[in-house]
Regions:
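Active-site cores that bind ATP or allylic diphosphates and position pyrophosphate for catalysis
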Residues: 2, 8, 13-140, 146-151, ...
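Non-catalytic terminal extensions that flank enzyme cores
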Residues: 43-44, 136-138, 146-199
Length: 199
């Protein structure tokens, strides 16, 4: 039942970081501080602040992801739950996304199994992130060149595709290519070894 799978958590990010930095702490994994609170402890804590709701992770993934938030303390659904429900609702069977989201995958796989245990498993592939000349992740917030700026600077769509495909290891040389040519030559099974991971 849902109550045995979840519990309220009153920990702040600061509390969790402090626990993770303690000797023998597991960085990034919730230490379970609120997991065994009694009913009276929960009532007292709830008078001070609204709790988040954590899902008890299965033993197989406990050390990897720990118990994770599915409802935030502001009562909004957390990303992990929202995206999993959305994927299931849309009938998604394959997801290709950046390697920066690989830590979310076991959580979403676990949630999907709980919500729809007889459904076909979603396959995940995590693509290598695009890096700039200094080896830093390309992102708009860090001022990386956008596609619009690329075009304004005289770059063509074919040159941009070539640059991205070359950076990802799909092309051996960075020579202009159009989208139709690129689609025809891309086989996910052949390039999967150049991508970060398949889950």
């Amino acid at each position: 039942d849902a109550q045995s799978l979840t519990y309220p958590c009153f920990c702040s990010r600061k509390d969790i970081q402090a626990a993770a930095s303690a000797p023998h702490g597991n960085t990034g994994v919730y230490p379970g501080t609120c997991k065994s609170l009694s009913a009276s402890d929960i009532i007292v804590a709830a008078r001070q602040k609204s709790p988040a709701i954590r899902l008890r992770a299965a033993a197989a993934i406990q050390s990897e992801v720990g118990d994770f938030v599915i409802v935030r303390s502001d009562q909004l659904f957390a990303y992990q739950l929202a995206v999993t429900v959305d994927d299931l609702d849309q009938g998604v069977t394959e997801v290709i996304r950046g390697a920066d989201l690989v830590d979310s995958t076991p959580k979403q796989v676990y949630l999907a199994q709980l919500l729809q245990p007889n459904r076909r498993k979603i396959d995940y592939l995590h693509a290598t992130l695009m890096l700039d000349d200094q080896g830093q992740r390309m992102s708009k917030r860090d001022g990386s060149v956008s596609a619009i700026k690329w075009r304004q600077g005289g770059g063509s769509a074919e040159q941009l595709l070539a640059h991205l495909a070359f950076t990802a290891g799909i092309l051996g040389v960075s020579k202009p290519i159009n989208i139709v040519e690129l689609i025809e030559m891309v086989d996910i099974h052949l390039i999967s070894s150049k991508l970060s991971s398949i889950y």
